[in-house]
Amino acid sequence: MKYLIASDIHGSAYWTERLCAAIESEQPDRIVLLGDLLYHGPRNDLPCDYVPKRVIPLLNALADRIIAVRGNCDAEVDQMVLDFPVMADYATLFDETGRELFLTHGHVFGAGMHNSIDHAPALPEGSALVYGHTHIKVNEASEAHPGLWLFNPGSVSIPKDGAHSYGIYEGGAFSHVILEEE
């Protein structure tokens, strides 16, 4: 099974269109959205082409393949316009081997700017904590939580490490993919 993992769209129609083109090309079985879908938040500058009303139908067209969690910039009003559940703080997936993928935005569990999770939930050894929030790509073993893999796809629209990106999980491995400008 192939998962495309994206986070921190923040209402950018331009970058959502780029993401949709990537989804068309990648043909994932499921799309994981790690929160902060429509609103840019008070600490972020407006992303390129900030038009949440254009983002809504783009995401709704993919609703049957989306698994989403709530970000710190998501609100109940977002659920009124999105055709897939978006208000859960976390979700859990299991890959073909039984490996647990714990999906969360990250803010609830203390995602830090230095590739850390302050309050990781108790997970079986070999599990992966898949999170967003920091807008920085991560793909590494946790030093603070032995046996836990950390993966952050970075940000679709407001990267803090220079490159707009998403992630892929397939065959037990995570990877980052850079979204190119048109």
Question: For the regions a protein language model found, what residue spans apply to each?
Answer:
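Core catalytic region of metal-dependent phosphoesterases/phosphodiesterases
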Residues: K2-D95
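Active-site-proximal segments of metal-dependent phosphoesterases and phosphodiesterases across multiple
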Residues: P42-Y50, L82-L123, K160-D161
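Short, well-ordered coil/turn elements that cap or connect secondary structure elements
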Residues: A61-A63, A88, E96-G98, P124, ...
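Conserved beta-sheet core of the metallophosphoesterase superfamily
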Residues: F84, H107-E181
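Active-site neighborhood of phospho(di)ester-bond hydrolases with catalytic His/Asp-centered motifs
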Residues: I5-S7, I31-D36, I66-N72, F102-H105, ...
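Beta-strand-turn-beta hairpins that frame and shape the catalytic cleft
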Residues: M1-Y3, T92-F102, E143-L150, G171-S175
